[in-house]
Amino acid sequence: MKVVNLTGRIKIGPSEVLHQEVLEPQFIYELEYYLLYYVAIEKVLLTEYKRLELITNENKEMIMKILDKVTKESINPDPTANMSDIAFAIERFVEQNLEGEVPAWHIDRSRNDFQSCAQIMFGREQLLQVIKEMRDLSNSVYKLAKKTVYLPMPGYTHYQAAQIITLGFYLAAVNEQILLVMEKLLGVYDEMNKCPLGAGAMAGGEFEWERNRMAMLLGFSEPRNHALIAVASRDWTLQISSELSNFGVFLSRFVTDLIQWGSSEYKFIDLPDQLSGISSAMPQKKNFPIFERIRGKTAHLHAFYSDFVLGQRNTAYSNLVETSKEAGTHVITMFETFKSTIRLLKTTVDNLSFNEKRMLDVCTEEFFGGFSLANKLTLSSGIPYRRAQVIAGQYILKMMETGFRPEHIDIGILKGIGLEHGLQIKLTSEQLKSAFDVTHNIENKKTIGSTNPNDIKILMDEQEKRYKDIEKQWDKREEYIKKSVSQI
């Protein structure tokens, strides 16, 4: 199997097993995901060859037209013709279609910066798609939060009823996390969007490539300022996967709450039939396996991050197939998994219905006002706060033992407990009643970021402004790419 005019170093092309197990799958992968970027890079290099007066304008235009004919159908992995390497395949395709030799075409160039550049262009495009999905999710969560600012529901700590909140308060927290991740990914994008092209194999080129212009034409903000970093680093895969993995932790917790709320014990939420499942044996059941799918998918995000870390760990800091290709095998799978997760979650958010009566019933069944009662005892009667906590707890226990609900207040029992502690309780019946009132427990919160609907409205107005700014920043970056590459 003789190699056709590609190297003088080896005489025989790739073996069948190497071709089938490694090179052909890699070629097909790059054909699917990188070809568009490879062609764009070739065109930018071509303009530089012309600027450097290494080729004529006539040759430049001829090669440009040939590059336009490079498609998924026009090149293929061939161990003898191109060593099953897509960069060589493009080179061979152009050479075979030239009307005459162009000796300086492809002078002073390497696959290393060529491949690194295409990979980053692919990665940033995928990241832009991720952000679009997250923007859609944010919009859905925001709209639902705004509609439910006044809808009371029980809040839990340690899986026990704790304080009354509103659904809008909870969902505003979800949206806050989404916005935070989109903001953090702006920094990741800006750091990764530095052009490796012109770095050569690892030490730079021997011609004065105009790297700033090459970077601009390919949609980068600037050239990567160190040739070794340009070809050795794949930090962008670690940074993106790290952020998505971390966000996956939060998503899993959010979905866990949804799973609990949808259980037969809670009965807080419901989904339409088209998003629900059934039991094959228990006809009374209506299941929500979509939540389990979403939560299960978040686990893969952590695995992808670990995979990229382990794929790069203990490798030499230089260009390596191990880090540039093998370690990134599942990059596209990570992006697709994340986008799928977000689309599924958005669909559930858009279709959730809430059992408002059930949520309110739980708010009135549990003694959520204990915290407020302790505060009132201290303020009205001068009782030291820790002792006020003890008295409030004893009052609640007594009421539970006698079978009373929170609204069935008994100021006599409370004052009797106070006397047992040698204290005079001056709290009125009206004040005691307010401590266990659902609306009072929501509206009496006064700190910034509390469940008070007024605070949540302020927060959501701020979130709307942040969202618009984030949207503007991402749109600006995407528009810059479109404008830049249109000049090629």
Regions found by a protein language model. Give the residues of each.
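A helix-coil-helix interface module used to build multimeric assemblies
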Residues: M1-G204, W209-R211, L275-S279, F291, ...
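Glycine-rich cofactor/substrate-binding loops
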Residues: M1-I41, N97-E101, M282-I488
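Short runs of predominantly hydrophobic/aromatic residues within well-ordered alpha helices
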Residues: L35, E42, A87, E91, ...
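Generic, well-ordered alpha-helical scaffold segments in large soluble proteins
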Residues: L45, Y49, I66-E73, F93, ...
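Short, well-ordered beta-strand elements within core beta-sheets of diverse protein domains
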Residues: T47-I55, F122, F169, L238-N246, ...
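Long, hydrophobic, amphipathic alpha-helical segments used as structural scaffolds
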Residues: D78, M134, S138-P152, M182, ...
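Charged, flexible cofactor/metal-binding loops and thiol motifs
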Residues: Q119-K132, K146, Q160-Y317, E322-T341, ...
